[in-house]
From Swiss-Prot:
It comes from Oryza sativa subsp. japonica (Rice). GO terms for biological process: positive regulation of DNA-templated transcription. GO terms for molecular function: DNA-binding transcription factor activity, RNA polymerase II-specific; sequence-specific DNA binding. This is Homeobox-leucine zipper protein HOX4. Keywords: Activator, DNA-binding, Homeobox, Nucleus, Transcription, Transcription regulation. InterPro entries: HD (IPR001356), HDZip_class_I_plant (IPR045224), Homeobox_CS (IPR017970), Homeodomain-like_sf (IPR009057), HTH_motif (IPR000047), Leu_zip_homeo (IPR003106). PROSITE patterns: HOMEOBOX_1 (PS00027), HOMEOBOX_2 (PS50071). Residues 15-24 have a biased composition (Polar residues).
Length: 277
């Protein structure tokens, strides 16, 4: 089989050449990749072998002003701009596409910068609030510890005061005061003095009952004993006489309450009066 003459003649088909040139120039697709190469250069779409053509400064300024007014490109507006600037409608469309891509990129950059600044501010505020929170928590913990210490001290003081109150002086009915102590001491002294008095009166009692005094008594004790013997003996005889007269009466009451014979009261004091006279 013979190949077609057009394929072996060394000249490619116009459609293939145009696609290759389009892919080489980077304008086959609209995107972020071609925005740097098409900022001020446009490719003529009429012939497959035509080269790039740089836009003039006036054309770029006119396109910028039109883009600032409206970034959307309609067919009537595209044809009018191409006619006014001496460009192809395809050139105007590609320039607007690339310009919108750059505008969106810059807009995203501005939004990102604003959001980044807001994030940094919020992060600083968050850190400050966290530090304040930690400080407040530490202060609350310290206050709770201090309050617990005060409550423990108060409870300890109350518990300490209760035994102190129970250990206080007892009531008057159950305890002893200074007067009671002195009374007890006086009783002890009196109890100590009682045997001495008993010992001193023992010879007298013995003399009164007719018993001889102790062998160890002195001369003074013997004289006092004899004097006391005479005194008690005289009184004892007088009492015996009165008692005999009181009990010898024949009446039931012994004549003590009789109207006819009152008791001779003058006889009680007759002897001392006669002695004094």
């Amino acid at each position: 089989m013979k190949r077609p003459g057009g394929a072996g003649g060394g000249g490619g088909s116009p459609s293939l050449v145009t696609m290759a040139n389009s892919s080489d120039d980077g304008y086959g697709g609209v995107g972020m990749e071609a925005e740097g190469d098409v900022e001020e250069e446009m490719m003529a779409c009429g012939g497959g072998g035509e080269k790039k053509r740089r836009l003039s400064v006036e054309q770029v300024r006119a396109l910028e002003r039109s883009f600032e007014v409206e970034n959307k490109l309609e067919p009537e507006r595209k044809a009018r701009l191409a006619r006014d600037l001496g460009l192809q409608p395809r050139q105007v469309a590609v320039w607007f596409q690339n310009r919108r891509a750059r505008w969106k990129t810059k807009q995203l950059e501005r939004d990102y910068a604003a959001l980044r600044h807001s994030y940094d501010s919020l992060r600083l505020d968050h850190d400050a609030l966290r530090r304040d929170k930690d400080a407040l928590l530490a202060e609350i913990k310290e206050l709770k510890a201090k309050l617990g210490d005060e409550e423990a001290a108060a409870s300890f003081t109350s518990v300490k005061e209760e035994p102190a109150a129970s250990d206080g002086p007892p009531a008057a009915g159950f305890g002893s005061s200074d007067s009671d102590s002195s009374a007890v001491l006086n009783d002890v002294d009196a109890a100590g003095a009682a045997p001495a008095a008993t010992d001193a009166l023992a010879p007298e009692a013995c003399t009164f009952l007719g018993a001889p005094p102790a062998a160890g008594a002195g001369a003074g004790a013997a004289a006092a004993a004899s004097h006391e013997e005479v005194f008690f003996h005289g009184n004892f005889l007088k009492v015996e006489e009165d008692e005999t007269g009181f009990l010898d009466d024949d009446e039931p009451c012994g004549g003590f309450f009789a109207d006819d014979q009152p008791p001779p009261l003058s006889s009680w004091w007759a002897e001392p009066t006669e002695h004094w006279n």
